[in-house]
């Protein structure tokens, strides 16, 4: 379930650090969080979709490691991102 182009551009615009930023940690975590939210909804209605569940676990691990990196680099950026996305840190 990839993100559609409009949603992806909206996420990039709301989390980018400068005008041409598309790959910063904040943008990557925001896109992963959106995909995790979509996949969680899919798995609530399709409980036996084990391959999607495995993909969800990979995404959660990737987001966790990116957040750990961001926290080690700048705790202020980490805190604002956590609040903006509404996720647990």
UniProtKB/Swiss-Prot annotation:
Transmembrane segments: none
InterPro entries: Ribosomal_uS15, Ribosomal_uS15_bac-type, uS15_NS1_RNA-bd_sf
Cited Pfam families: Ribosomal_S15
Keywords, ordered alphabetically: Ribonucleoprotein, Ribosomal protein, RNA-binding, rRNA-binding
Skewed-composition ranges (Polar residues): 11-22
Biased composition (Basic and acidic residues): 1-10
Stored SMART domains: Ribosomal_S15 (SM01387)
Annotated Gene Ontology cellular component terms: cytosolic small ribosomal subunit
Biological processes per GO annotation: translation
NCBIfam families in the cross-refs: S15_bact (TIGR00952)
Role: One of the primary rRNA binding proteins, it binds directly to 16S rRNA where it helps nucleate assembly of the platform of the 30S subunit by binding and bridging several RNA helices of the 16S rRNA. Forms an intersubunit bridge (bridge B4) with the 23S rRNA of the 50S subunit in the ribosome.
Family indicated by similarity: Belongs to the universal ribosomal protein uS15 family.
Quaternary structure, from the entry: Part of the 30S ribosomal subunit. Forms a bridge to the 50S subunit in the 70S ribosome, contacting the 23S rRNA.
The protein's name in its UniProt record: Small ribosomal subunit protein uS15
Gene designation per UniProt: rpsO
């Amino acid at each position: 379930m990839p993100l559609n182009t409009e949603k992806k551009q909206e996420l990039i615009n709301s989390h980018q650090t400068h005008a041409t930023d598309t790959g910063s940690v904040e943008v990557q975590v925001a896109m992963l969080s959106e995909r995790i939210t979509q996949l969680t909804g899919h798995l609530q209605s399709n409980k036996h979709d084990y391959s999607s569940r495995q993909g969800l676990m990979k995404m959660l691990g990737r987001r966790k490691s990116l957040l750990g990196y961001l926290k080690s680099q700048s705790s202020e950026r980490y805190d604002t991102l956590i609040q903006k996305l509404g996720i647990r840190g």
